[in-house]
A protein has these predicted regions:
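N-terminal [4Fe-4S]-dependent radical SAM core
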Residues: 1-23, 30-41, 54, 58-62, ...
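Conserved AdoMet/S-adenosylmethionine-binding subsite of the radical SAM
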Residues: 53-65, 74-214
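Conserved functional loop/turn residues at catalytic and ligand-binding sites
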Residues: 26, 35-38, 90, 113
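Flexible loop residues that form catalytic
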Residues: 39, 71, 122, 189, ...
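Conserved Rossmann-like nucleotide-binding pocket used by diverse enzymes
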Residues: 23, 69, 185
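Glycine-rich phosphate-binding "P-loop"
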Residues: 38-44, 65-68, 72
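A C-terminal junction/extension of Radical SAM enzymes
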Residues: 210-230
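Glycine-rich, highly charged phosphate/nucleotide-binding loops
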Residues: 45-55
Length: 230
């Protein structure tokens, strides 16, 4: 596993769980609003996998889970083997994904190696390439959504609401696409760290009022629907 970041404790990233977080290096997207630029480009200092596993071993009974984020964790060839090691230590695993590897995601779910999946739905279908900075196979995105809704033990979908790239109508389109999903988060755009595209560095986030107005329009499509990051 190419691990480029590690946080020993988080109360926010795994719902109702005190977790540690690792960031895997590399991503097949170049989302202009991404704030993990070093991780995505593989420029972060790599951490030994055994160091993470040793920490988890020592923190048994104190930590309640591990979040594997990135980058795109499912790019890692040994993600399955790593998840197996973490599960053997007794930890629930949350994986963040962009949805471009539905087969690998299903394998992890079928092998009971993931307990919570968070998938970023970047845009409505017609804007996906623009929001990801890459040519995207929408079939794979759709397949991942299908797998998560049908098979994931627990899950959330989420969209970062980027001013100038997405507006309320786009979020409504995403909500229609995900209709019936258990949980959705509308995430506030943040530019307090270097972004993939410097063009967004001085873009102001949408107001709390506009986020809540958008939230009220999409609530009927989800069992649970929230704003995050305001």
């Amino acid at each position: 596993m190419k691990i480029g970041g590690f946080q020993k404790t988080s109360l926010l990233d795994y719902p109702e769980c005190i977790s540690a977080i690792i960031w895997t290096m590399g991503c097949n997207f170049r989302c202009p609003f991404c704030y993990n630029k070093q991780i995505v480009l593989g420029d972060a200092e790599e951490m030994p996998e055994k160091e993470i596993l040793s920490f988890l071993e020592k923190r048994k009974g104190l930590l309640e889970g591990l979040v594997i984020t990135g980058g795109e964790p499912l790019l890692q060839e040994d993600i399955t083997a790593f998840a197996e090691k973490v599960k053997k230590l007794g930890y629930p695993v949350k994986i963040d994904t962009n949805g471009t590897y539905p087969e690998k995601l299903k394998e992890l779910i079928d092998k009971k190696l993931v307990d919570y999946v968070a998938m970023d739905v970047k845009a409505p279908k017609n804007k996906y390439n623009q929001l990801t900075g890459a040519k995207t196979d929408i079939f794979k995105i759709e397949k991942s959504i299908e797998v998560i809704k049908a098979d994931a033990p627990d899950y959330e979908f989420r969209t970062t609401f980027v001013p100038g790239l997405l507006k309320k109508e786009d979020i409504v389109e995403i909500a229609k696409w995900l209709d019936g999903a258990k949980r959705f988060y509308l995430q506030q755009f943040k530019n307090n760290s270097p972004l993939m595209s410097s063009k967004l560095d001085n873009v102001a986030p949408y107001s709390k009022e506009y986020l809540n107005e958008t939230l009220n329009e999409i609530k009927p499509f989800f069992k649970n629907c929230y704003v995050r990051g305001v």
